[in-house]
């Protein structure tokens, strides 16, 4: 069973016309090309996994007629989901309140090996991946 918010997102896809779908695919191809061009001088691009402190489930549950923090969560992941570039999300710390912080290692199309090697190197130098969050409210 889907939550009302997820059900709404799925149902909104039923209203996309074939013309709008083709336009969106063309825009996606253009954007993918722009991202590939912008990353030519780097091996990977490291970003936060989310642009805000990790919200609780309560923070992401919309009240009737209200938006939630959940919509902001996909700002970084959505870019690379759209372009099809490989990404690896790994823990890199905690907020003062104990909420987990993650970073996203993003690579060139079809270069998963570099993304995973960078992630592995980070994990060898740190121990964040071995430290589970403690005493925090339920998170998504």
Where do the language-model regions lie?
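Short glycine-/small-residue-rich Rossmann-like dinucleotide-binding loops
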Residues: 50
């Amino acid at each position: 069973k889907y939550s009302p918010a997820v059900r709404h997102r799925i149902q909104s896809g039923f209203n996309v016309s074939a013309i709008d779908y083709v336009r969106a695919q063309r825009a996606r191809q253009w954007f993918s090309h722009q991202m590939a061009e912008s990353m030519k001088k780097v091996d990977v691009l490291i970003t936060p996994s989310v642009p805000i402190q990790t919200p609780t489930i309560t923070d992401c549950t919309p009240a009737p007629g209200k938006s939630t923090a959940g919509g902001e969560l996909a700002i970084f992941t959505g870019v690379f989901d759209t372009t099809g570039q490989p990404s690896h999300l790994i823990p890199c710390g905690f907020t003062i309140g104990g909420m987990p912080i993650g970073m996203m290692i993003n690579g060139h199309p079809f270069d998963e090996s570099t993304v995973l090697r960078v992630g592995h190197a980070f994990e060898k130098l740190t121990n964040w991946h071995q430290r589970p969050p403690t005493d925090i409210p339920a998170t998504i």
